[in-house]
Structures are given as structure tokens and as C-alpha cells.
From Swiss-Prot:
GO biological process terms held by the UniProt record: lipid A biosynthetic process; lipopolysaccharide core region biosynthetic process
Family to which this protein belongs: Belongs to the LpxK family.
Pfam families: LpxK (PF02606)
Protein name per the record: Tetraacyldisaccharide 4'-kinase
Length: 320
């Protein structure tokens, strides 16, 4: 919500709802911690990559980097996801080349496309973990989001923070964007700052790669040309800022709701002769009707020195 990131007096009308949300969240987490609710403990190490605020903070690029790094050093990771924005007629859903974004959600489809590793979607993450344990030789599980899914025990918690917007007005939903109190950051293993620098936080930078055609054809798009742009992510302006940094001249920029299910009609507002740029996450939802002049901008995550080894050391502690 825009008012989460700028002062508005009427937001305090939502205070009773925020207090109710706080009470429910606290009691729910406490119930799992004290054993009143059952938690599933996997035989494999589980790493949660999540956030304490609503909206896109950069979890998916981090998950992709993490899995690539683990593969490089010899691990066999698998990814689980709730599949937000998708709806399947059965779960657990194993993401494959034939699975579309409207079934699995855009992030799981993107992760599978980039990595080719097992990606399993289930609103109940415990069932996704069990599916991986039964059907794959994975030796570590990465949960894309799920910090607040306390029914699943975890070994490492990593929180991604938006380095520009941070935590908005620092209030709990619905007054603010927080899913949990800021004090929750004190109990996680790593806090990763996407695009900013803060003491005791790991700096993550998203580096833009060469633009790719959405339809999969091989071609090149030079930076500096005039383009239109669209983004259906938590913070579209971040993507538009990235395009500006790549020297693209944006003629028209349109932000859609996060996880928007694209159709052909969404693109009639753009001049067909002008290249259209979108995020890689959005591109996986548009392949069936992509035009030759549609492009996406892949990004890769880079980190401050020493973080990779810190994380590997923490994983080794679990496996000992």
C-alpha cells in the first residue's frame, strides 16, 4: 500500500486491526515454539529465505544465487514454494517445462527455468518437503519465502530487506507493511540488504545482464534505445530505475499489481514498434503470446566479501 511508505494521519484508524494482527501473530508463533502446534522436522537441512515485510524485496534472485552457489560446491538443492499467484488442481506440484505461471506461480517457474533443479509447490510447505524427501536425492532444501510458516522447522533463516524502502512506517499490517515486529530480525541468521548498506546486514546488489527475447529467440537489444516498460512486482519502480541505470530511455512505464496474471489485452496500451522491457519473473507468464519486440532483463545477485563462506560455514555446522 502506498500509504505504508509516506505519512498519512488516517492510517491510525486501522490501529485496532493492527493490534489484532499483532496478537494473533504472536500467539501463533508462541504456540509452535511451545509445542502446542506440531512442526515438521525434515531429515534434510532447511534454509528459509523470507522477509518480515510485504512486497518484493529480492528473494527470488537470492534463492537463485544460493542454489547456484550450493551446486558449485557440491550440494544438491531443491526448492519449495507456496506458489503465490498460481492455482493448481493438485498438490504437491512438481514444476516442469510444461507448468505455467498461472499454475505454479511466477517465482517457481522462473527458478526452475534458470536452474533446472527440483522445485515443488504446495501451500502447505511441509507436504512439499515430504515430496522432495520421497522422490529426489536432494541434500538441502531452500524455501522461497515462508519465514512465517512456522509449521515447518528450519535450520537457517535469511531475511531479505529492501535497501531503499526498508520497512516503510515500521508498523504492522494493515497500518504498515510489517508481517512481524522488527525485533524478529534479532533471531534470524542473516539479514541481507538489497541495494543498500546497513551495519550488521549483508549487502546484496542486483547486477543487470544482457536483455533476452521473451519468445526465446536469440537477439540483442542495445542499451540507450527508447523503450516501454512494465513490471508486476512488489516495487515496480526498482525495475524502472534499473532500466534507467542501463541507459534505456523509457517512454512509458506501467506498474501492475504483484503477481499480476498477464493477458494479451494488458499490452494493447504499448506502441508495438517500440521495444517493451519487463522483468524475467514477468516474462515467464508471457511466453505463450510474446511478440518479437518484447524483452526481459535478467539480473544476478552479488554480495559483500566473505558472505558466501559465512553461509557455507553455517550450513556445515548443521550437517555435522
Amino acid at each position: 500500500m502506498p500509504f505504508w511508505y509516506r505519512p498519512v494521519t488516517w492510517a491510525w484508524l486501522l490501529l485496532p486491526l493492527a493490534l489484532l494482527f499483532k496478537m494473533i501473530s504472536f500467539c501463533r508463533r508462541l504456540a509452535y515454539q511451545k509445542g502446542f502446534f506440531k512442526r515438521y522436522k525434515s531429515k534434510l537441512p532447511v534454509i528459509i529465505v523470507g522477509n518480515i515485510s510485504v512486497g518484493g524485496n529480492g528473494k527470488t534472485p537470492f534463492v537463485i544465487w544460493l542454489c547456484e552457489m550450493l551446486i558449485t560446491v557440491g550440494y544438491k538443492p531443491a526448492v519449495i514454494s507456496r506458489g503465490y499467484g498460481g492455482k493448481s488442481n493438485h498438490y504437491p506440484l512438481l514444476v516442469g517445462d510444461h507448468i505455467k505461471g498461472h499454475e505454479a506461480g511466477d517465482e517457481p517457474v522462473l527458478i526452475h527455468k534458470r536452474l533446472g533443479i527440483p522445485v515443488v509447490v504446495d501451500p502447505n510447505r511441509k507436504n512439499a518437503v515430504k515430496y522432495i524427501e520421497q522422490h529426489f536425492l536432494a541434500d538441502i532444501i531452500i524455501s522461497d519465502d515462508g519465514l512465517q510458516h512456522y509449521a515447518l522447522q528450519r535450520d537457517i533463516e535469511i531475511v531479505i530487506v529492501d535497501g531503499k524502502r526498508r520497512f516503510g512506517n515500521q508498523h504492522l499490517m494493515p497500518i504498515g507493511p510489517l508481517r512481524e515486529n522488527l525485533s524478529r530480525l534479532n533471531s534470524v541468521d542473516f539479514v541481507v540488504n538489497n541495494g543498500g548498506q546497513q551495519v550488521n546486514e549483508i549487502t546484496m546488489l542486483l547486477k543487470a545482464q544482457n536483455c533476452q527475447r521473451v519468445d526465446g529467440e536469440t537477439a540483442q537489444l542495445s542499451s540507450g534505445v527508447q523503450v516501454n516498460a512494465c513490471a508486476a512486482i512488489g516495487y515496480p519502480q526498482r525495475f524502472f530505475d534499473t532500466l534507467n541505470q542501463q541507459q534505456f530511455e523509457i517512454l512509458k512505464a506501467v506498474g501492475f499489481n504483484d503477481h499480476h496474471a498477464f493477458s494479451k489485452d494488458d499490452f494493447t496500451q504499448f506502441e508495438a514498434s517500440i521495444p517493451l522491457l519487463m522483468t524475467e519473473k514477468d516474462a515467464v507468464k508471457c511466453t505463450d503470446f510474446a511478440q518479437p519486440n518484447w524483452w526481459y532483463l535478467p539480473v544476478s545477485a552479488e554480495f559483500s566479501a566473505g558472505f558466501e563462506q559465512q553461509l557455507l560455514n553455517r550450513i556445515k555446522e548443521i550437517k555435522c
